[in-house]
Amino acid sequence: MTTITPCLWFDGNGLEAAELYVSVIPNSRITDVSYYGADQPGEEGSPLTVAFELAGRPYTALNGGPQYKFTEAISLQLSAADQGEVDRYTELLTDGGGEIGPCGWIKDRFGLSWQVVPEELPKLIGDPDPVRANAAMQAMLGMMKIDIQAVRDAADAAVATA
């Protein structure tokens, strides 16, 4: 069976990152760690790769060195069932030096970008009623962390005044 596993390049802290991610996201675990050997480019005995699962999907963290950095061109989209999950994921993933950006985007302390998205948000901004959809979109565009009740209220208010 063919599989695809995203490989995330870290500068020596891939195990620490994987430990954070599996502690935050349900149904997640570290499945394997390999280590640099004596004749390899990294420090002998330090983690080379970390295989882990997030929400049951495979990932690899590679401690490749400082040559490459994460950018917002790649992000992990994390679906949140409700506002409590949005708040929890945002808090835990930005703890220790992460940043909160616009429209639910965050960057964790390792530089990896995430989109913390309430499950209801795509329905609101994709509503078949263009007035509701636009109001929801405009509300979201003015936010940092998504407040799903405020987005819902904006959509409802737009219909009430239309």
Where are these regions (language model features)?
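C-terminal cap/linker of serine protease catalytic domains
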Residues: 128-162
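Vicinal oxygen chelate
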Residues: 24, 54-57, 69-70, 74-113, ...
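Conserved "turn/edge" positions that cap or connect secondary-structure elements
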Residues: 7, 54-55, 120-123, 130-133, ...
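A charge-rich, low-complexity, intrinsically flexible signal that marks solvent-exposed coils, linkers
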Residues: 2, 40, 72-74, 162
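Core segments of cupin and vicinal oxygen chelate
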Residues: 8-56
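Active-site-proximal beta-strand/loop segments in catalytic clefts of secreted hydrolases
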Residues: 62-64
